[in-house]
């Protein structure tokens, strides 16, 4: 679903009506929530919205390619309040978090973040959130697009652990790009530069309560700014845009181009409930030697023992420049046999290539393998290549 602003009207594409922005009843109803930054993003030029975690997310500030250049040359501010938080507290909160994920958290310090997986009893991935440890027994899961709140509450019922699982009033923004550090210094002072990659700290900006982490969904230098009072969303957005004016800051949206360059996953596209961590090469996020009987442990042991039947790979497509990301899964063929699918594809103007993430039969996953992709009624040649496509060691993001 994509909502598009046309002139003074908000149109729901593939639907038969439009609502003006002045209509108080704009939207699909209260089941799809607006973020605290919604009005600000419209003022700053958002022309299209998608739906993610039952919320509107800005997806169109004009040219996606220009958004990409803004990101990698200066900085962009993205409304990612759709990364809804699951808050876990209580005397057994740490034990519960370790039950929920196969990643070893024994060295996770207070003030640290970790990229984790949440899997079901069959080892299928339910979400790939960032975990934030605010205190000894106080955690947030910053979610991808699925209802982990319900899953966590369900697991807690029979866990025998003392935990409280809720959704807090927390709405993140992402400030990403090489100039993001300078903008943050202008807002919070030089001490913000001491914040290390994948760590967090509590801040207050003119009475606005925040948690700031050195994380983001861009593979660029960046920060996530977690607002802890939704009533101050408009004020926060304006303060950041004002501070970034002299640094080339632009309003923007998460860049499909940059995240595919960086090999970053998009849940529902590159991973889902039928995908296991080993197929994605995420063995490091699974600790099968743990004494904890975490959800999915037995299934993951069996998958590891039996071996995977398919694998995620990088692909270069040899065709005309793609006009935008794929909106369907494109079949990958070995002659007449379907052996996989393209999950995310885009043209990279920096690399001057069509690049993609794909899931293929393990027999065809070797680097250099030449295959074909069916794009609508065309057959396109392709080659399996190394991923990520750019900055594979994440030196930019961690700098």
Regions found by a protein language model. Give the residues of each.
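Acidic active-site catalytic centers that drive phospho-/nucleotidyl reactions
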Residues: 79, 128, 224
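N-terminal glycine-rich flavin-associated loop
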Residues: 78-91, 131-140, 260
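Single conserved hydrophobic/aromatic residue that forms the stacking wall/gate
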Residues: 1-14
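Internal amphipathic helical hairpin motif
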Residues: 91-125, 180-208
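Acidic, proline/glycine-enriched N-terminal capping motif
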Residues: 13-116, 124
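Short, charge-rich binding segments
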Residues: 107-109, 118-124, 129-135, 155-157, ...
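Conserved beta-strand and immediately adjacent loop positions that scaffold enzyme active sites
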Residues: 2, 74, 115, 329-331
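Conserved, structured C-terminal
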Residues: 13-54, 58-59, 133-399
């Amino acid at each position: 679903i994509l909502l598009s602003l046309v002139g003074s009207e908000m149109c729901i594409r593939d639907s038969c009506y439009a609502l003006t922005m002045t209509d108080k009843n704009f939207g699909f109803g209260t089941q799809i929530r607006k973020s605290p930054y919604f009005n600000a993003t419209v003022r700053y030029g958002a022309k299209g919205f998608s739906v993610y975690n039952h919320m509107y997310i800005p997806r169109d500030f004009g040219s996606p390619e220009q958004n990409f250049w803004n990101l990698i040359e200066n900085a962009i501010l993205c409304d990612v309040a759709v990364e809804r938080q699951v808050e876990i507290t209580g005397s057994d909160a740490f034990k519960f978090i370790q039950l929920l994920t196969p990643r070893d958290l024994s060295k996770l310090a207070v003030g640290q973040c970790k990229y984790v997986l949440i899997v079901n009893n069959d080892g299928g991935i339910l979400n790939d959130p960032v975990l934030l440890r605010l205190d000894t027994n106080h955690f947030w899961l910053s979610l991808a697009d699925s209802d982990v709140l319900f899953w966590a509450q369900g697991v807690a019922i029979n866990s025998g652990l003392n935990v409280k699982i809720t959704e807090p009033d927390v709405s993140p923004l992402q400030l990403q790009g090489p100039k993001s550090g300078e903008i943050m210094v202008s807002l919070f002072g030089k001490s913000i530069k001491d914040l290390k990659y994948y760590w967090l700290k509590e801040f207050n900006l003119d009475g606005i309560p925040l948690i700031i982490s050195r994380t983001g969904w861009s593979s660029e230098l960046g920060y996530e700014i977690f607002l802890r009072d939704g009533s101050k969303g408009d004020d926060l957005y304006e303060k950041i845009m004002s501070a970034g004016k002299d640094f080339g800051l632009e309003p923007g949206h998460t860049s499909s181009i940059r995240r595919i360059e960086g090999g970053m996953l998009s849940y529902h596209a590159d991973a889902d409930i039928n995908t296991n961590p080993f197929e994605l090469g995420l063995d490091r996020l699974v600790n099968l030697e743990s004494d904890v009987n975490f959800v999915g442990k037995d299934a993951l042991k069996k998958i590891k023992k039996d071996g995977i039947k398919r694998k995620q790979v990088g692909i270069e497509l040899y065709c005309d420049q793609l006009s935008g990301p794929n909106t369907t899964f494109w079949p990958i063929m070995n002659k007449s046999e379907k052996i996989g699918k393209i999950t995310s594809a885009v043209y990279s103007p920096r690399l001057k290539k069509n690049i993609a993430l794909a899931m293929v039969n393990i027999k065809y996953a070797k680097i250099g393998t030449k295959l074909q992709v069916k794009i609508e009624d065309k057959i396109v040649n392709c080659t399996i290549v190394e991923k990520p496509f750019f900055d594979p060691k994440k030196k930019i993001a961690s700098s």
